[in-house]
Amino acid sequence: MSEYKYLSGFGSHFSSEDERYPNSLPVGQNSPQVCPYKLYAEQLSGSAFTAPRTENMRTWLYRKLPSAAHLPFQPFKGAEYFSQNWDEQPPNPNQLRWKPFDLPPKDGKNVNFVEGLHTVCGAGDPRSRHGLAIHIYSCNGSMDNSAFYNSDGDFLIVPQQGVLDITTEFGRMSVAPNEICVIPQGIRFAVNVDSPSRGYILEVYDDHFVLPDLGPIGANGLANPRDFETPVAWFDDRDVKDFQVISKFQGRLFVAKQNHTVFDVVAWHGNYVPFKYDLSKFMVINSVSFDHCDPSIFTVLTCPSLRAGTAIADFVIFPPRWSVQEHTFRPPYYHRNCMSEFMGLILGKYEAKEDGFAAGGATLHSMMTPHGPDVKCFEGASNAKLVPERVAEGTQAFMFESSLSLAVTKWGEETCQKLDAAYYECWQALKNNFQITKN
């Protein structure tokens, strides 16, 4: 996997050919009467044809057989806990915390990426192209002779344990913990693993993930475009006679059989592509004077809504950094938010709650549900000597923040048996320190 090659950039128009078949891209046009090597030309659209040029997304694929060459789709009976039913549980406004989600049992059958999808929470409706879902994947087997694609939206995948070897129609990429990848709507992919693997998925229905505007930060900072990587063209030259394609369509899974692999794209060009990003390359912005900055300064990617400055979903990280603020309570402040905050932990311990929030687990603080540092964190930070120090060293926490009110599935609230009923206790020992006279 380390030998995989990539194209650098975000939102760029790329061109790529499998090096085994040079000159496989048509010259000067997209759809010649006969394509080089007698390939089929197929356009994959990620936006309306008439979308503004700055937002128009599409890629031309040159493949051995068109994607339409398959048998009819039938309901797929795997992935029992992959759901888009937001009404199966009553609303729960409490602070929620999950202990690390289970990996597949060592003595059980192999579970691949699709079979190991479990939905935790979400909102909206993929049929109206509005909303999101948050899933956990837990797998110990590879997707042999099969592929998956999402008709409903984009997947942002956050590995927490185990390296994902992902084959897409565009080529191959390796995604390890502390890296992420995005598979846009409709792009077919397969996940191979060589050890038990677990991670988080943010699925958005509305639009695609983009880089946040930088405003007064300037032209550089946060996640820089040059650090995003898109795989180079590669096709599977095996003669596969029994292949299945799994589709997520209107919130449900379907499967179709065909007598050839979908990974037969010899060349492609366009700007609608899968990509990966190494979170260690994020350029952190922080206060160098006083006060705790809002977490929006840690935004890696965003899926914007129609309301200016308000996201359907933001992907935010809390990376290792220097903390130097003077006369300041440095950890995250106590908060009631008009947004929903789902947090996960990839590595180490989270700075505001070192106890109880473990790697592979999660928290959900719903709209206007109060949250903030636990007693240990508050007392420690209130009395700490304020010297420059490294924080979050050896850790990587992240947040999926959304303007939508998220409903928790039955699997998330009951079946997984990971919900920590004692979470609320971390705030119960907070004292009333009010003094009539100022400090």
UniProtKB/Swiss-Prot annotation:
Q: Which UniProt keywords apply?
A: Dioxygenase, Iron, Metal-binding, Oxidoreductase, Phenylalanine catabolism, Tyrosine catabolism
Instruction: Give the pathway annotation.
Output: Amino-acid degradation; L-phenylalanine degradation; acetoacetate and fumarate from L-phenylalanine: step 4/6
| List of residues binding Fe cation | H335, E341, H371
Q: What is its EC number?
A: 1.13.11.5
Q: Which GO terms describe its molecular function?
A: homogentisate 1,2-dioxygenase activity; metal ion binding
- NCBIfam families per UniProt: hmgA (TIGR01015)
Could you say which cofactors this protein requires?
Answer: Fe cation
Family the entry assigns: Belongs to the homogentisate dioxygenase family.
**What is this protein's record name?**
Homogentisate 1,2-dioxygenase
Per its UniProt record, what InterPro entries does this chain match?
HgmA_C, HgmA_N, Homogentis_dOase, RmlC-like_jellyroll, RmlC_Cupin_sf
Catalysed reactions, as listed in the record: homogentisate + O2 = 4-maleylacetoacetate + H(+)
Listed Pfam families: HgmA_C, HgmA_N
Q: Which GO terms describe its biological process?
A: L-phenylalanine catabolic process; tyrosine catabolic process
Source species of the chain: Drosophila melanogaster
